[in-house]
Amino acid sequence: MTEWTPTERRRLRIGIAILALTPAFVGIWASITPRGFYDDFPGGGRTWVSAVSVYDEHLVRDVGALYLGSLVVLAFAYVYLERRLVQAALVSYAVAALPHLVYHLTALDNLSTGDSVAQITGLALNVVLPLGLLATTTRGGSERWRESMDRSAPGRSPASPTG
């Protein structure tokens, strides 16, 4: 059931597609060539991963697989745009992105100023964008959403919001 206006649907789909770029890029690269990912991420002569940690093929492959799992959830959210699925995808993305950002805020010593700014900006966007999109899922149509919650929540009925 679609509960958003066409503008909200478009905004959500664009935002989810942008979010999906990171897990697609990281997930595919780290899964297929873990050593290349470690040595060369994010590309263009930059070496953000190898600058802050030792190589561990198992860990890099696991990170790649986890990013691919996140990509699958985002893809389902993009295709179906079901409120709870979209909210779960966005919250889980932000939950993973926040400690990642916090760690990298404390591990900037081996990076140039430009790389530090680029890295932290990208990581911060991975926290802020899903939270901003999450706000879209509770605005506009929020009355319809509340009504659907009343109808679908266990032990609740539309006539009795407290059950």
List the predicted regions and their residue ranges.
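Hydrophobic alpha-helical membrane segments
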Residues: 88-104, 124-129
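Core segments of alpha-helical transmembrane spans in multipass integral membrane proteins
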Residues: 53-78, 95
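Non-cytosolic membrane-interface motifs at loop->transmembrane helix junctions
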Residues: 111-124
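Short, highly charged, low-complexity non-transmembrane loops/tails of multi-pass membrane proteins
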Residues: 145-163
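Hydrophobic transmembrane helix segments
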Residues: 21-59, 64
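Membrane-water interface at the C-terminal end of transmembrane alpha helices
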Residues: 126-147
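Cytosolic juxtamembrane helix and N-cap/initiation of the first transmembrane helix
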Residues: 1-26
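Juxtamembrane helix-break-helix junctions at the cytosolic face
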Residues: 5, 71-91
